[in-house]
C-alpha cells in the first residue's frame, strides 16, 4: 500500500504496459519476438482505447512505477520488471510469459495477495535458462524450430487477443 500511496493521487487506469525483458539476460526475448509482441500489444491497446507503454528499466524509480500504477493490464516475460505490478490497482490484469517447467510461481502469489487478475500465457515461454520463444503447437513448450516470423506473429496475436478479451470481461 505504501508504494501505491507514493503515487498520489490515485491515477486513472488508462494504460497497457509491456514489461520488456532486458537483452543482457540469459532469458532474453529475441528481437523478432520482442517486435512481434510490441506490435500486437500496441494494437491491443488501440483496440481497447488504452495508451501503450513499454517499460524502460533505465528510468528513475518514480518513472518506472507510474505506468504500472495507471495500468489496466501489464504483460511481460517472467522477470524482475513484473515486480513493479505491486504498484497496480486491484483488478489490474497481469499476464506472465513463463519460464517452463514451472517451479514456483511468485507472480501468481503476488497477484493473489494484491487482488490482481493473473494469467499465465505458456504459448510464449522460456525453458529454464534459455531464451523466450513462441511455442510449437506439437511441443509441450517453447521450441526453437518454431521461431520463424509466422509463428512469432501468430503467438503474439493470440496473446493480444487474450489480453483484449480479459480487459473487456
Give residue ranges: language-model regions.
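The feature primarily captures lumenal catalytic ectodomains
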Residues: 1-169
Amino acid at each position: 500500500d505504501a508504494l501505491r500511496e507514493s503515487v498520489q493521487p490515485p491515477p486513472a487506469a488508462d494504460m497497457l504496459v509491456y514489461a520488456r525483458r532486458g537483452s543482457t539476460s540469459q532469458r532474453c526475448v529475441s528481437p523478432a519476438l520482442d517486435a512481434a509482441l510490441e506490435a500486437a500489444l500496441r494494437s491491443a491497446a488501440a483496440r481497447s482505447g488504452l495508451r501503450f507503454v513499454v517499460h524502460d528499466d533505465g528510468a528513475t524509480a518514480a518513472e518506472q512505477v507510474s505506468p504500472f500504477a495507471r495500468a489496466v493490464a501489464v504483460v511481460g516475460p517472467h522477470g524482475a520488471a513484473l515486480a513493479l505490478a505491486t504498484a497496480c490497482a486491484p483488478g489490474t490484469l497481469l499476464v506472465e510469459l513463463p519460464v517452463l517447467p514451472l517451479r514456483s510461481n511468485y507472480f501468481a502469489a503476488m497477484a493473489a495477495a494484491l487482488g490482481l487478475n493473473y494469467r499465465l500465457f505458456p504459448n510464449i515461454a522460456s525453458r529454464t535458462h534459455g531464451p523466450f520463444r513462441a511455442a510449437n503447437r506439437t511441443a509441450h513448450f517453447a521450441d526453437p524450430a518454431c521461431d520463424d516470423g509466422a509463428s512469432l506473429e501468430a503467438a503474439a496475436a493470440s496473446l493480444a487477443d487474450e489480453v483484449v478479451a480479459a480487459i473487456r470481461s
